[in-house]
Curated annotation (Swiss-Prot):
Encoding gene per record: CHRM3
BP terms from Gene Ontology: adenylate cyclase-activating adrenergic receptor signaling pathway; positive regulation of MAPK cascade; positive regulation of smooth muscle contraction; saliva secretion
Keyword RNA-binding in record: no
Organism field: Gallus gallus
GO cellular component terms given for this protein: plasma membrane; postsynaptic membrane
Protein name: Muscarinic acetylcholine receptor M3
Region described as Disordered: 370-404, 431-471
Keywords assigned: Cell membrane, Disulfide bond, G-protein coupled receptor, Glycoprotein, Membrane, Phosphoprotein, Postsynaptic cell membrane, Receptor, Synapse, Transducer, Transmembrane, Transmembrane helix
Location relative to the cell: Cell membrane; Postsynaptic cell membrane
Disulfide bonds: C189-C269
Keyword presence, Phosphoprotein: yes
């Protein structure tokens, strides 16, 4: 049997020989083409050798010339002898060649070595950072009890989805890019695509849940946070994963059975139904465009609400040097000024307020009017003292840095004023005005005069007070009623004046007490609001960073998906980059936590520096010392 080398030798010895065609005078192709074809078939595949077992018929088949030439001519489809008794099996050779091409693909996918090294290095670094970052989030949630909040449960679910992407999706897609073809079969392809799309969409759904949680926590802090439990958070997380699974997994795994055939080639891996425009648009809208629209709207509302809270807090923390008015707020929320407590502060320095103290308030009372009539001086002095004492009582019960009483403290007034046993206060819709106080004082003086009690005495000679002008006013002492008395000391040389608590209406005392409690708790309320606002700002910053990263990384791919539905005009390199950008979002999320959340940042640092064991040891040592101290104290106490 002649080998293929012998055939090529005989071919080269007769290179100039041509076979005349008795019917069409067709020139046979050069010997070079025929030799290359025969050599490839017989050298690369032993299964093709039986085709040439009858070498004599293959080499010299008829009288027109060497049979090899005849067979070579028929092999390229250009010569067919009518006297041929055997035909060369052309279809078998072509099938063999196609199988050879499938099994001898370039393992580097046509890439140069340096390109493969660069791709593997970059994608490997990104995958490693993704895995480490999301593992840090999960471990931080485990070791730090302060991170076990409802909001962080959503971040934990997001980290799990991103970890799946880093471990499975990134590495398989990198292998697919480098090799240039899919080498793991159809089943592995469908499973990879299912895990990839479900985890990616779960990441999106978790971001959507976090956005809703932040929005309701800020806009409905009382009603929503009472219902915001760990169990409800688990239900919402479960729904996010279930929706993602239902949206992608069945369609990816069973679409070939729905349509009755699989159109994805064996050496490629992509979603089969992406060629259907309606389904592609539907999944793109449900998986990306609708969630990103909702998240953008929610974030805008969160931003506006946070800005509004910031302005309110700035109003609560307004400087005492600014002109402000102490206001009581009606329970319906409408602001209503009360003249007896309307302490119209002038824009003066604190030193001026300390200098004049009560006199400053006495001079700025609206109800006080200078009276030069000597006959009415005592009565006017009594009225003026009434008003001035009201202001002085308020000044004694609060610091000089009082702030406006806004809606946050109206509940305190309601509680204090609605004490049992005071029907007059319960039935009143507003606190007594200065006119009411004046009338009460007038009636009290009149009743005292009728009962022939002692008349009010002059306390001191008139004293001049300088505050933008000269005022001269004398003070009178109100009649003393039976009961406990208080002593109010006037500053700047004004002598002590003794008055009774019964001289003022009971409602005024309760109003003063209400203001005292309100101002005392005001700093605590402001502090709590400030801390709450800081937390809301941090949460909004974290959400904004995550949302921004999500939009940047996911938009290119989802645009290419829609474009690819109508035309196959997206370059393969651009498609791979867009696909990888979606993966990078899973890398960015843990970085957003670390940059925007101090608690996560400190826990990351503790874990990376291996300080967790040291912290536990210090805690154990502290507990042991405390135990020793406790046991030492017991015998002493027993003795």
């Amino acid at each position: 049997m002649l080998t293929h080398y012998q055939l090529c030798f005989q071919k080269r010895s007769s290179q100039n020989y041509t076979v005349p065609d008795p019917t069409s005078c067709f020139d046979v192709p050069p010997w070079t083409i025929l030799c290359q074809r025969a050599t490839m078939i017989m050298h690369n595949n032993s299964s093709a050798l039986p085709l040439f077992s009858n070498v004599s018929s293959f080499w010299k088949r008829d009288s027109h010339g060497p049979g090899l030439l005849d067979e070579g001519a028929s092999l390229i489809g250009s010569y067919d002898s009518p006297e041929t008794t055997e035909s060369f099996p052309f279809s078998t050779v072509e099938t063999t060649n196609s199988s050879l091409n499938a099994t001898i693909k370039d393992p580097l996918g046509g890439h140069a070595v340096w390109q493969v090294v660069l791709i593997a290095f970059l994608t490997g670094i990104i995958a490693l950072v993704t895995i480490i970052g999301n593992i840090l989030v999960i471990v931080s949630f485990k070791v730090n009890k302060q991170l076990k909040t409802v909001n962080n449960y959503f971040l934990l679910s997001l980290a799990c989805a991103d970890l799946i992407i880093g471990v499975i999706s990134m590495n398989l897609f990198t292998t697919y890019i480098i090799m240039g073809h899919w080498a793991l079969g159809n089943l592995a392809c469908d499973l990879w695509l299912s895990i990839d799309y479900v985890a990616s969409n779960a990441s999106v759904m978790n971001l959507l849940v976090i956005s809703f949680d932040r929005y309701f926590s800020i806009t409905r802090p009382l009603t929503y946070r009472a219902k915001r439990t760990t169990k409800r958070a688990g239900v919402m997380i479960g729904l996010a994963w279930i929706i993602s699974f239902v949206l992608w997994a069945p369609a990816i795994l069973f679409w070939q059975y729905f349509v009755g055939k699989r159109t994805v080639p064996l050496d490629e891996c992509f979603i089969q139904f992406l060629s259907e425009p309606i389904i592609t648009f539907g999944t793109a809208i449900a998986a990306f465009y609708l969630p990103v629209t909702i998240m953008s709207i929610l974030y805008w509302r969160i931003y506006k609400e946070t800005e509004k809270r910031t302005k309110e807090l700035a109003g609560l923390q307004a400087s005492g040097s600014e002109a402000e008015t102490a206001r009581f707020v009606h329970q319906t929320g409408s602001s209503r000024s009360l003249s007896s407590y309307e302490l119209q502060r002038q824009s003066t320095k604190r030193s001026s307020r300390r200098k004049y103290r009560r006199c400053h308030f006495w001079l700025t009372m609206k109800s006080w009017e200078p009276n030069t009539d000597q006959g009415d001086q005592e009565h006017s002095s009594s009225d003026s003292w009434n008003n001035n004492d009201a202001a002085a009582s308020l000044e004694n019960s609060a610091s000089s840095d009082e702030e406006d009483i806004t809606a946050e403290t109206r509940a305190i007034y309601s509680i204090v004023l609605k004490l049992p046993g005071h029907s007059a206060i319960l039935n009143s819709t507003k606190l007594p005005s200065s006119e009411d106080l004046n009338e009460s004082a007038d009636e009290l003086q009149k009743s005292d005069t009728d009962s022939q009690e002692k008349k009010p005495k002059k306390l001191q000679p008139p004293k001049s007070i300088q505050d933008g002008g000269s005022f001269q006013k004398s003070f009178s002492k109100l009649p003393i009623q039976p009961g406990s008395a208080e002593t109010a000391t006037a500053s700047d040389g004004i002598s002590s004046v003794t008055k009774t608590s019964a001289a003022l209406p009971l409602s005024f005392k309760e109003a003063t007490l209400a203001k005292k409690f309100a101002l005392k708790t005001r700093s605590q309320i402001t502090k709590r609001k400030r801390m709450s606002l800081i937390k809301e700002k941090k949460a909004a910053q974290t959400l904004s960073a995550i949302l921004f990263a999500f939009i940047i990384t996911w938009t290119p791919y989802n645009i290419m998906v829609l474009v690819n539905t109508f035309c196959d005009c997206v370059p393969k390199t651009v498609w791979n980059l867009g696909y990888w950008l979606c993966y990078i979002n899973s890398t960015v999320n843990p970085v957003c936590y670390a940059l925007c959340n101090k608690m996560f940042r400190n826990t990351f640092k503790m874990l990376l520096l291996c300080q967790c064991d040291k912290r536990k040891r210090r805690k154990q040592q502290y507990q042991q010392r405390q135990s020793v101290i406790f046991h030492k104290r017991i015998p002493r106490e027993a003795s």
